[in-house]
Design a protein with these regions (language model features):
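Specific aromatic-rich, kink-prone transmembrane helix
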Residues: 155-176, 185-193, 207, 216, ...
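Short acidic/glycine- and proline-prone juxtamembrane loop motifs at membrane-interface regions
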Residues: 145-155, 390-391
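Membrane-interface alpha helices of multi-pass inner-membrane proteins
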Residues: 133-134, 183-200, 207-212, 231-237, ...
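Transmembrane-helix motifs of polytopic, lipid-linked glycan transferases
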Residues: 101-124, 162, 166
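Transmembrane signal-anchor helices characteristic of membrane glycosylation enzymes that use polyprenol
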Residues: 17-50, 234-245, 308-320, 380-383, ...
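Transmembrane-helix signature of polytopic, membrane-embedded enzymes
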Residues: 114-140, 157-158, 180, 184
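Membrane-proximal lumenal/periplasmic loop motifs of glycosylation machinery
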Residues: 38-48, 62-87, 96-107
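Membrane-lumen/periplasm interface segments of specific transmembrane helices
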Residues: 197, 203, 208-213, 219-334, ...
Length: 457
């Protein structure tokens, strides 16, 4: 049986088309590990590991209770779940280089997990094509930086992907009577989504989206009851932190956290930026759709909503309600930085991408409100809460949601000519990676140089 499978695999490789795809996958993987050994820092945030994450991990190894009680003094505004995992489960956390390599390997394994879940959902698609699609996350600058420098973010994506796998299983049986297998899937979803939340607090949208989905799809009451009980149990660590800190975050050492950093007042300010992120990550998918549809049909799908959003944004900019978009030195995303490179303090390019993002979201809402809106609306709200919206917050979130959550004809169009689609997809994010490396390693290798370019003191 094993010999037969091996022979089949090598016969596939002998096919020229398959051989080319395997070569591309191999090059992506090589670039990923090469990035680690060359100390790639394509988003500029890698070095903060030594000032933030590493001291916390070592403190946890020495004294758990002291570190918990004084966690806010480390200036980390997250729940310490990932640090605890690193301190007590990662066997390489005694040495910096070994630890960073271990996180790089874990991040590579996440790519394989992502591929496996994609294959589960898109069973008719060849495994080589699935691997090629999934390898895209290995090209994403923020994902790579987190991996190479031992940062925490990628743990959140691991648990998020696992949670979406169990949610996929739950959706398939949502109207059926509960059985042991179904109950186990519910408990595992609640566990993995809770871990995802503890690793990245913005992923709190997932339990919210889950319950909204159950409500709008008339889920069996046993599913809802089992979910509530499970989430209550998995919330116990958070309750213990609240008892220790007096809040969900350590406000004694960070008293302005809920007034300066996380607050609903930032919703409107961040909305154009978040829309531009959707436009940025969906652009290659739209290019693929453009080549698969007649020009008129493509334009009819998006033109009205695009022009509506663009007119609104241009009007708001003319009355100076969006002038703050020209004053960013941090955050805002790649498109805003490219916009500044073209013309300082200008944000027209960002508004164009925001309009594209708005148009895509309107299309997704129309296609399946019960599924797509229940996931996307909580994302749009929760991710607009921070004072500064960084692109790393949604990378690779938007791509994961597209392939594992959304119900859209864009997926069918992508798979219609999958070789061409993968070529566009991989090429787009390769250019993005190369641009990020050039920007951070050569053009502006320090924050001070970027501020000098912007004429900001």
């Amino acid at each position: 049986m094993l010999l037969s499978a091996v022979n089949k695999f090598f016969l596939m490789i002998l096919n020229k088309n398959i051989f080319f795809k395997v070569t591309v996958i191999s090059l992506v993987i090589i670039s990923f590990f090469l990035g680690y050994f060359l100390r790639e820092n394509s988003t500029g945030g890698g070095l903060e590991f030594y000032e933030l994450s590493w001291p916390i991990i070592q403190s946890f190894k020495k004294d758990f209770l002291f570190t918990i009680k004084n966690y806010g003094s480390f200036r980390d505004y997250t729940i310490p779940f990932s640090h605890i995992l690193n301190a007590y489960i990662n066997p390489f956390s005694n040495d910096v280089e070994n630890f960073q390599l271990s996180v790089t390997v874990i991040s590579f394994i996440i790519f394989l997990v992502f591929a496996q879940v994609c294959k589960k959902i898109f069973r008719q698609i060849n495994i080589i094509d699935i691997l090629l699609i999934s390898s895209t996350i290995l090209l994403l600058p923020f994902y790579r930086t987190s991996a190479f420098w031992g940062k925490n973010e990628n743990y959140g994506w691991l648990f998020f992907i696992l949670a979406l796998y169990f949610f996929y299983e739950i959706k398939n049986d949502i109207s059926k009577s509960s059985n042991n297998r179904h109950t186990i899937n519910i408990i595992l979803f609640c566990f993995t989504s809770s871990c995802a939340l503890y690793a990245r607090q913005a992923l709190a949208f997932l339990p919210i989206s889950y319950f909204l989905y159950l409500f709008f799809n008339n889920a069996d009451k046993k599913i809802i009851i089992t979910s509530i009980i499970s989430f209550t149990i998995f919330a116990i660590p958070a309750l213990l932190l609240i008892l220790t800190w007096g809040n969900v975050f350590d406000l004694e050492n960070n008293p302005n956290f809920f007034t300066w950093w996380i607050h609903p007042k930032h919703l409107l300010k961040n909305f154009p930026i978040l829309l531009s992120f959707f436009g940025f990550y969906f652009l290659p998918i739209l290019v693929i759709e453009f080549f698969n549809l007649e020009f008129k049909n493509f334009i009819n799908k998006y033109l009205k909503s695009f022009l509506f959003a663009l007119i609104i944004f241009v009007f708001l900019s003319q009355v100076n309600l969006l002038s703050y978009l020209g004053d960013y030195t941090r955050a805002g995303g790649a498109i805003l930085k490219v916009n500044y490179l073209i013309q300082k303090n200008n944000y027209l390019l960002l508004l164009l991408f925001s309009s594209v993002g708005f148009s895509v979201l309107m299309r997704l809402f129309k296609e399946d409100v019960k599924n797509n809106a229940t996931f996307l609306l909580p994302v749009l709200i929760i991710y607009c809460f921070p004072n500064l919206l960084y692109q790393e917050y949604v990378e690779p979130l938007i791509l994961i949601i597209f392939f594992l959550v959304l119900k859209t004809n864009l997926q069918k169009i992508y798979f219609r000519n999958i070789s061409f689609s993968n070529l566009i997809f991989i090429s787009y994010f390769t250019v993005y990676l190369i641009g990020s490396i050039y920007f951070k390693h050569f053009a502006f290798d320090s924050y001070e140089k970027w501020k000098i370019f912007l004429n900001v003191q």
